[in-house]
Amino acid sequence: MRKQATAIWTAWAALLFLRCAAWAEDRKPAWTLGLFVENDVFALSDGGYTNGVKLVWVSSGLGDGPGKGRVPRWLDTMSRKLTPSRTPDRRRFVSVALGQSMFTPEDILRKDLVRNDRPYAGYSYAALGLHRATPASMESFELDIGIVGPESFAGDIQQFLHRVFNWSYPEGWANQLKDELALGVAYDHKWKVLPAGKAGEGNWDLITHAGGMASNVFTGAAGGIEFRLGRHLPDDFGTALIGPGGDSASLFDGTAPRLPGRGNFGFHVFAALEGHAVARDIFLDGNTFRRSHRVDKLPFTVDIAAGIAVRHGRLKASLAYVYQTKRFKGQELKPLLGSLNIAVLF
């Protein structure tokens, strides 16, 4: 089973690399490669949602006719059916992502099962996103497939990194959730409330969003708001955390660049608030079809983020600190983590 999982994830990574290399041959219009890294080490802690990594490729704007986009014909056809461009200012995009998330109890030095804390859990996944956007709003549809459990290799990776960097060694991964195939669909809608002008116009804006996901990993709804203030605000839809629809933060098109003129410089600070209504969370509720450790999750949670973003030429980077309310009953510490996002236009 371990060899089969290795082959599957290697094939996914190779496919992503080869397709990106092929699409890069034609530089007009442009596409974007984004890297999301979230870790509690930025907040000098270790436990809870301890690490998340996501590599995202986002296409350029696709044409309305079959085969006009720089993606495989079947994917372009799917995008046209699910996200039709009915108005001249509406553009379609496709995204492909590979990601992994890790969860541990606060005391990672214990080898026994920590019954009053969340279970060890790892999740590795691939995601296909279809997006349609106007200058003032964007919709995202996403399909996720992955695996929870030892075959996600999250435990192996954390133990390896802690050994290499001589950090406190996580001893309890033998108690992690069992292997489970993960399938899910998600929807997210973002709106630029004020102002919704052309790229680079104005020194501030306000972005709201609402959406939800249905899967055996996570089922629930979310909504939030982000305020941005700075110089030459980018023509995108905010700085997202890892999650369904988060790929859209990397959307970047040569016909509507985040900044007027690729050599210009811009920066801004931002603050965001997001609330969640949680029906299911496998990382707290435990495995869906097998007995495993679980805790009593809280049905409503909140994330508060603040950070800074800079953009120069083809590169955009942002760094945020995120405060999370407690996720389950009896949780002693409120989670803190840092979120780094780097996006490059090709």
Predicted regions and their residues:
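Outer membrane beta-barrel transmembrane domains
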Residues: 106-110, 226, 232-346
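Residue-level signature of outer-membrane beta-barrel architecture
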Residues: 57-59, 100, 130-132, 189-193, ...
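Short loop/turn motifs that connect adjacent beta-strands in outer-membrane beta-barrel proteins
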Residues: 24-30, 61-92, 133-140, 193-206, ...
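Residues that define the transmembrane beta-barrel architecture of outer-membrane proteins
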Residues: 47-53, 120-124, 139, 179-185, ...
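Transmembrane beta-barrel strands of outer-membrane/channel proteins
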Residues: 33-39, 94-102, 143-149, 208-216, ...
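Extracellular loop and loop/strand-boundary signature of outer-membrane beta-barrel proteins
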Residues: 112-116, 169-175, 211, 290-294, ...
